[in-house]
């Protein structure tokens, strides 16, 4: 066991790989995956450990020098046999995503630098998703979508998820919603690839075992023209989470726990690689929550080794060939952190920083004005299922306004169509109505980042809000004096019922 370096009884860290005892993992957890195509994926995947040693250098990297997952992905994308942290390399990009906030600027820079009549490097590798400032009367926000539409038509962009009827999102079959959830649902997230996006939470896609990170408009403009980007290879921190997940915890609790341990600067320009038995037990949506917030710790990217859960999700959404990679047994990590998840409690991040961690039960005297359930972090189908489960178990009505913003059209439909397990066939929407919540809103980023004054559920007053979103900086959801407590859907729902920050164990046993 590694030495304890924190006052927390749940965390151990070792500065060397040998201290961690890699050899203690059972041999049966090794895996063997060859190049994957739809319907031809190995079913022998049982864990997330390094591949067997008889693999060729072409798929495992250097035999003498081990590499991490991120290093292998970047080595392959740069056509090198070996890369090490600190290397500056030109990387071939598999997918570039942009949205209505940054898309016009990225295309503008592309035209300025490459010429008004220049063509993008590959119109089938660019994904354009309106999602931020959508359902608003703000003319400038609406103009951004118009500009993207013009560029996508001109460039024959295949994957432009357009919206034209702002009064009825369901009248727009191409419209999806929040980019990071839509990317996964539409099959753009694939193990072993490089995915870049003009949004800091692009790191969400690392849940699929790929290198995914956010970039600025200037870099995006260059990628539009060349399909390449200059990157510095990041060192990798490893987070090993073991133990049975308590029924009252969610991935949001795990990532808030981690950020609280290492701080918002603790992973600056580093990869955060997650593994362990707890990670293996998580669904894809929960893994997405985990990777979504690595940037709140300063991380360059987050990554989870792909396993059967990953491949089952991906193969049902794409026919594009992909090749998973895994960290070598002799790969170098700059730090190892180990958590016993079975001993963790529900947590929140108090204003005004994601690392201002506290136990939910320690904040029981904090009165709140509203609850917000939504965003790329906490607006997925399983997030709403969790909130509905708690509401149903409690059998009570909310004491504060509770706003629900599904991330995508698919999530919105799931809220109205899928029965909540153990609720007698009731859907989320039915349970939310019985609990007195607001009607689920049109899918978008909504009030997560404030937005125009008429944005649904925006904090226009200095109120206290419990939110399933990812940031709680001053002004993040609107009013500069607003106070945001970041929490899991369970904790958010419990807080809605009590009118204060609440521990979900009050309602979940």
Swiss-Prot record:
Positions of [4Fe-4S] cluster binding: 376, 445, 448
GO biological process, any: glucosinolate biosynthetic process
Chain segment of the transit peptide: 1-47
Assigned keywords, A-Z: 4Fe-4S, Amino-acid biosynthesis, Branched-chain amino acid biosynthesis, Chloroplast, Iron, Iron-sulfur, Leucine biosynthesis, Lyase, Metal-binding, Plastid, Transit peptide
Compositional bias annotation for Low complexity: 1-24
Keyword Protein biosynthesis among UniProt keywords: no
Biochemical pathway: Amino-acid biosynthesis; L-leucine biosynthesis; L-leucine from 3-methyl-2-oxobutanoate: step 2/4
Disordered: annotated span: 1-25
Gene Ontology molecular functions: 2-(omega-methylthio)alkylmalate dehydratase activity; 3-isopropylmalate dehydratase activity; 4 iron, 4 sulfur cluster binding; intramolecular hydroxytransferase activity; metal ion binding
Superkingdom of source: Eukaryota
Localization (cell): Plastid, Chloroplast stroma
Keyword Transmembrane helix: no
InterPro entries assigned to the protein according to its UniProt record, in alphabetical order: Acnase/IPM_dHydase_lsu_aba_1/3, Acoase/IPM_deHydtase_lsu_aba, Aconitase_4Fe-4S_dom, Homoacnase/IPMdehydase_lsu, IPM_dehydratase_rel_enz, IPMI_cat
Enzyme Commission numbers on file: 4.2.1.33, 4.2.1.170
Cofactor note: Binds 1 [4Fe-4S] cluster per subunit.
Alphabetized CDD domains for the sequence: IPMI
Family: Belongs to the aconitase/IPM isomerase family.
Function recorded in the entry: Catalyzes the isomerization between 2-isopropylmalate and 3-isopropylmalate, via the formation of 2-isopropylmaleate. Functions in both the biosynthesis of leucine and in the methionine chain elongation pathway of aliphatic glucosinolate formation.
Protein name (database record): 3-isopropylmalate dehydratase large subunit, chloroplastic
Organism: Arabidopsis thaliana
């Amino acid at each position: 066991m590694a030495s304890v370096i924190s006052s927390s009884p749940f965390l151990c860290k070792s500065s060397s790989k040998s201290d961690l005892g890699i050899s203690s993992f059972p041999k049966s957890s090794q895996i063997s995956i060859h190049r994957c195509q739809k319907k031809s994926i190995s079913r022998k995947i049982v864990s997330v450990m390094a591949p067997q040693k008889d693999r060729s250098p072409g798929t495992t990297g250097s035999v003498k020098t081990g590499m991490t997952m991120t290093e292998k992905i970047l080595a392959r994308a740069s056509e090198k046999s070996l890369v090490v942290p600190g290397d500056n390399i030109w990387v071939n990009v598999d997918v570039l995503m942009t949205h209505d906030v940054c898309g016009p600027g990225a295309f503008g820079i592309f035209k300025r630098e490459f010429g008004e009549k220049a063509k993008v490097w590959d119109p089938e590798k660019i994904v354009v998703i309106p999602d931020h400032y959508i359902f608003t009367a703000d003319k400038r926000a609406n103009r951004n979508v118009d500009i993207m539409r013009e560029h996508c038509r001109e460039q024959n962009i295949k994957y432009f998820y357009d919206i034209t009827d702002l009064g009825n999102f369901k009248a727009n079959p191409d419209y999806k919603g929040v980019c990071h959830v839509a990317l996964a649902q539409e099959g753009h997230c694939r193990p072993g690839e490089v995915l870049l996006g003009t949004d800091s939470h692009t790191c969400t896609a690392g849940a699929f075992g790929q290198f995914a990170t956010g970039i600025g408009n200037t870099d995006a403009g260059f990628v539009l023209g060349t399909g390449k980007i200059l990157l510095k290879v990041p060192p990798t921190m490893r987070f090993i989470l073991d133990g049975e997940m308590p029924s009252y915890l969610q991935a949001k609790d795990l990532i808030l726990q981690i950020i609280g341990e290492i701080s918002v600067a603790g992973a600056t320009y580093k990869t955060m690689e997650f593994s362990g038995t707890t990670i293996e037990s998580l669904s894809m949506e929960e893994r997405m929550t985990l990777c979504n917030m690595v940037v709140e710790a300063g991380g360059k990217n987050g990554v989870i080794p792909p396993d059967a859960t990953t491949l089952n999700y991906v193969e049902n959404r794409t026919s594009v060939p992909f090749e998973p990679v895994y960290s070598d047994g002799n790969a170098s990590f700059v730090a190892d952190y180990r958590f016993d998840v079975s001993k963790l409690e529900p947590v929140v991040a108090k204003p005004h920083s994601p690392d201002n961690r506290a136990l939910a039960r320690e904040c029981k005297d904090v009165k709140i004005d509203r609850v917000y359930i939504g965003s790329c972090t906490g607006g997925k189908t399983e997030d709403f299922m969790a909130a509905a489960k708690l509401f149903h178990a409690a059998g009570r009505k909310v004491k504060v306004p509770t706003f629900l913003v599904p991330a995508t059209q698919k999530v919105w439909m799931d809220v109205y169509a899928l029965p909540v397990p153990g609720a007698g066939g009731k859907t989320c929407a039915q349970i939310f109505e019985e609990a007195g919540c607001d009607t689920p809103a049109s899918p978008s980023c909504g009030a997560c980042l404030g937005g125009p004054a008429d944005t649904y559920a925006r904090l226009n007053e200095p109120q206290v809000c419990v939110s399933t979103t990812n940031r709680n900086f001053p002004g993040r959801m609107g009013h500069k004096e607003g106070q945001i407590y970041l929490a899991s859907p369970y904790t958010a729902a419990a807080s809605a019922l009590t009118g204060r920050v609440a521990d979900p164990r009050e309602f979940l046993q």
